[in-house]
Swiss-Prot record:
The UniProt record lists the keyword Nucleotide-binding: yes
Originating organism: Cupriavidus pinatubonensis (strain JMP 134 / LMG 1197) (Cupriavidus necator (strain JMP 134))
Gene coding for it: cmk
Gene3D superfamilies from the UniProt entry: P-loop containing nucleotide triphosphate hydrolases (3.40.50.300)
Residues annotated to bind ATP: 11-19
Keywords: ATP-binding, Cytoplasm, Kinase, Nucleotide-binding, Transferase
Database matches in InterPro entries: Cytidylate_kin, Cytidylate_kinase_dom, P-loop_NTPase
Name this protein carries in UniProt: Cytidylate kinase
Amino acid sequence: MTIVHVITIDGPTASGKGTVAHKVADAVGYHLLDSGALYRLVALASDRIGVDIEDVDGLAKTASRLDVKFGPDRVWLSGEEVSLAIRAEAIGNRASAIAVHQPVRDALTKLQRDFRKLPGLVADGRDMGTVIFPDAQLKVFLTASVEARARRRYKQLIDKGISANIEDLLRDLEARDARDRNRAAAPLRPAEDAKLLDTSDMTVDQAVAQVLEWFAAVRKA
């Protein structure tokens, strides 16, 4: 049986996991799964049709019917490019609230696992190594101080032309961290066999180099 290698990169909001995952995928020539984008797509789609964030059945149905397409740095929902729309802070907060519901997570599980194709996959999210790909060849858990993450998120938003307030971002991150850690469905935590990487004082390239070093060691084993 052909083994399709998977690298999982999990961590809290704005820990740098998305950027690191993208660069690692480019370096090794693997497919990329941005699982957070899927939850943001559910948030956007459900918001547009008026589904309340506590309507679990409605949210799960929305998740199961997602018509999505991913391209380099772009994403489409039902044929409409929504790359910028899903990155709005309001959609991010809604996605975090929606992600606590197990039926929504269940609806997205198969969709996420379908990304596992040759030559391999780099998957970033919050439960990639613990729930979606527990047999991944390399599991990485990225973290950083909440202050460092707030600064990064602020820069990301400003660079994209989205207005932001760093104090508001700090409060939002703290609230999301608490919600992610304490939810009953797939709480945010490192897999037991994950490599821990604190990126508070690291550049993106340094973090990428460390992940690639770990993966090279895994492939030699």
